């Protein structure tokens, strides 16, 4: 159905929101890692931050790509080009 179709620009807002959520979570994890005195917990928190970093980067890249996809002046990220 046509009303269920999402444009690339609308999709870019979803990617941006996802990136914002990931960024906030990473800030929370960094704070928790700084505040804990348990070395094992700190290690787990830091590891989780490292695992989230590529997801955040990808969400940011895809937000830009989908927002600018039809702009002829935009130089697309080769990582996402077929």
Give the role of each language-model region.
Residues 1-23, 31:
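Short, charge/polar-rich alpha-helical segments
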Residues 29-40:
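Secondary-structure edge/capping motif, primarily at the C-terminal ends of alpha-helices
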Residues 26, 48-71:
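Amphipathic alpha-helical coiled-coil segments
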Residues 13, 39-54:
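Short, charged, amphipathic alpha-helical segments
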Residues 40-41, 65-82:
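Long amphipathic alpha-helical coiled-coil segments
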């Amino acid at each position: 159905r046509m009303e269920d179709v999402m444009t690339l620009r609308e999709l870019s807002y979803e990617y941006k929101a996802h990136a914002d959520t990931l960024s906030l979570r990473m800030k929370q994890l960094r704070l928790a890692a700084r505040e804990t005195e348990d070395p094992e917990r700190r290690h787990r928190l830091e590891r989780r931050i490292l695992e989230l970093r590529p997801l955040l980067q990808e969400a940011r890249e895809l937000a830009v790509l989908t927002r600018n996809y039809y702009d002829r002046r935009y130089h697309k990220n080769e990582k996402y080009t077929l």
